[in-house]
Amino acid sequence: MQKALLVIDLQNDYFPGGNFELWNTSNVLQNTLKAIEKAKQQGVAIVLVQHIANPANGVSPFFNEGSKGVDIHPAILAAAPEAPIVIKRFADSFEATELEAKLTQLGTKEILVCGMMTQNCVTHTAISRAAEKYKTSILTDCCTTVSEIFHMIALGAVATRMTLQTSAEAF
């Protein structure tokens, strides 16, 4: 069964010095880097997802095209330099993107979802209608949001619909 690790929105604006710093980003970054390394060792495809705010909607609080904050964190790019990058403008990484085509091209049957923010882009991607054809898991230690409580609430909300596991359990 071909697996793919989806790394969603690990972008500079969510880290210290960014426009919308999240909770626990250092630990999540380290856990995600370990997951990427294990994925590479096990032949699991890696797909990076980058949110770019739609300029037609005016200036966004973060992820504005051309800003430093919109860039994927350099450690992620260094860890997965060959990974395709899917650009999105919505919380659901499948909506109006090439993600589904990329996963089909890779022969993907299972997706391991991680990233930022847990209650938004991570869960919206994991519960997307387009994700229904995949065995879907969220890597709980490779996700974060504005606070621990929001993170836990978001994971609890999708717990009956998919597997929640740590990256160590997944790999």
Model-predicted regions and their roles:
Residues 15, 19, 24, 33-37:
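Active-site neighborhood of HAD-like aspartate-dependent phosphohydrolases
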